[in-house]
Amino acid sequence: MESRHAIREAAFQALFALATNPEADKDAVYAEVLPQDTEVPAYLTTLVEGVLSKQADLDAALTPQLKKGWSLSRLTKPDLIILRLGLYEIRYEEAMPEAAAINEAINLAKRYSDDQSAKFVNGILANFIQATPQA
């Protein structure tokens, strides 16, 4: 598993599995989402551990981007996980261009949700970037 796209997709699947069953063993989850006899890529661990450890910060940054009256609990689980993953890459993976992180999140939404969700994810992440002062 060499492509970042495939690793990102595996990270989404692992995060979804862990959100569904927080008691699950991460190594067992990685074994489920990776092809058989595949070593766990370092970037997969970085994404999963990063999103989990920064989840409160990510959620706090996402909440103001939602429309009035909306909360994170109202989002579907796939959409929330995709938003967290995309925002994690935007905020913490400096080598990842913001536009690429958004594009990857949109692709995940198209695959694991629907076109409406893809537009929603695009809007939320783009709004976050616009609202964030550039260094």
Curated annotation (Swiss-Prot):
It comes from the Bacteria. InterPro entries: NusB-like_sf (IPR035926), NusB_fam (IPR011605), NusB_RsmB_TIM44 (IPR006027). GO terms for biological process: DNA-templated transcription termination; transcription antitermination. Pfam families: NusB. The keyword Transcription regulation applies. Keywords: RNA-binding, Transcription, Transcription antitermination, Transcription regulation. GO terms for molecular function: RNA binding. Involved in transcription antitermination. Required for transcription of ribosomal RNA (rRNA) genes. Binds specifically to the boxA antiterminator sequence of the ribosomal RNA (rrn) operons. Belongs to the NusB family. HAMAP family: NusB. This is Transcription antitermination protein NusB. It comes from Lacticaseibacillus casei (strain BL23).
